[in-house]
Amino acid sequence: MALATQSNRIKIGIRPTIDGRRMGVRESLETQTIRMAQSVAQLLQTHIRYTDSTFVECVVADSTIGGVAEAAACADKFKRENVGLTITVTPCWCYGSETIDMDPHMPKAIWGFNGTERPGAVYLAAALAGHSQLGLPAFSIYGTEVQEADDTNIPEDVKEKLLRFARAGLAVASIRGKSYLSIGSVSMGIAGSIVNQAFFQEYLGMRNEYVDMMEIKRRLDRKIYDQEEVDLALSWVKQYCKEGVDVNSLENQRNAEERAELWENVVKMTIITRDLMVGNPKLATLNYAEEALGHNAIAAGFQGQRHWTDHLPNGDFMEAMLNSTYDWNGVRPPYILATENDSLNAIGMLFGHQLTGKAQIFADVRTYWSQDSVERVTGWRPESGFIHLINSGSAALDGTGEHQDAQGNPTLKPAWDVTEEEAKRCLENTRWCPAVHEYFRGGGLSSQFLTKGGIPFTMHRINLIKGLGPVLQIAEGWSIDLPQDVHNKLNQRTNETWPTTWFVPRLTGKGAFTDVYSVMANWGANHCVATHGHVGADLITLASMLRIPVCMHNVSEKNIFRPSAWNGFGQDKEGQDYRACQNFGPLYK
């Protein structure tokens, strides 16, 4: 994806507020207050990254903020510096509403120092009251332990909240102003591919862009692509992409010449779709200056079925490759591309990528397998039921689990940590199977792999409900291993040409997490995103910034971090979330 330049990156603004009384009070606090700001900046600049791998940049106000004039000067500087979220820090009393961040669209947090010499907690409470009264929700950060006035260390509980806020806030700011590109329209009546502009504009601050799938066909026919890159890609594909089982009847199988043409077309489709999203300067040198610009798309969706796939190769290869962290150009950040133009799953993939820097798995929530059903079909009885996540398209090849952590365990890494060796192992453990003719008459190549077990994943999904708006579902759990013969039997009766993840959610014994069946039964749509790691708490924080209520999750209550104003909407966390989101409304409305 085209990278942001150093000058226009989203930055995190640090606002050191102070007691404005001169002639002794303010002067005695300057050093401590500035040190707090510097320590927060240092923490964030060594722990939070942009998705292109570089560490986040922080901007500290030119002076401490003791009143409205300095608050306004800080706001002006932050506008010039492209600050997208702010953290206010103070060890002392300050003048509440005179010193707060008043920007209605920027996520904001306040860290009030827990010390006895000066009332940092009192300012924190006063400022938060002002934020709530003005309808500008802010996050409260206050350590559990009293610190000495000269202690420059950030306590672990404070660090956790600062980092969670920063990850979520940076995601909010980074997607604002970008585009979602619909390539095609509604796929097979799937609700997620009925693109809802109000959701994108009012909740995410994003544009909607549209091109007909014929634009891909036009570029194929008129050779509007970089032929040198196509040649490189085809050579790379020949070396690293191995064909898998062909389950089609003999009359529907393609010969070697036809398969070569198929490979050439799907490679070109991949390059063309990327160019549609983010542009390609090389096209300008070919006298296609308009096409060279792209659509400023941070995410996209490809309709495919059925208007394209009944006649032309499906998008499985391009979706899988673009969503992965590796191709013929080497290791790079993934491009977010949803199969069947499921725009809501695309946003889930975008959230997961922005929070982690990692590639995402797009999947159908295909089958709940109970213990009895597995035993009846295979003769083997598992410890519990599990869910089969499988889809022909947008599962990143990183989902094989062929990356390794420091202990040698299977994992998924952010692009900046992926090695060439790990990327190649993902390819070695993937086969490209000819598309099933009955589904895809135009042919295609689907990735076939099995996700290794023992990897923590967070399954999540945004759904739109008329009269309510968007809601978010979250289920943290793990991939599991099945005995090879059991996997083969279950996979072959489903679709052995597609990628599979066997998933077990973490159960609570209550509600939607009473058992594995309940998770599947309460899922709100046919698709989900699987993000590596247990990131439900980060998703909850992100959703609260956008005013999207969470209808289902298995995250521990102690890890739920939302704006302090939510506390005014009752004591039940789920209910207060709905009431607060309804009260404050979409972030950009």
Curated annotation (Swiss-Prot):
Active-site residue numbers: E340 (proton acceptor), D364 (proton acceptor)
**Cofactor(s) this protein requires:** Mn(2+)
Q: Where in the cell is it found?
A: Cytoplasm
Which SUPFAM superfamilies does this UniProt record tie to the protein?
Answer: FucI/AraA C-terminal domain-like, FucI/AraA N-terminal and middle domains
- Give the record's GO CC terms: cytoplasm
Similarity annotation = Belongs to the L-fucose isomerase family.
What NCBIfam families does this protein's entry cite? fucI (TIGR01089), PRK10991.1 (NF008220)
**Designated name of the protein:** L-fucose isomerase
Which species is listed as the source? Haemophilus influenzae (strain PittEE)
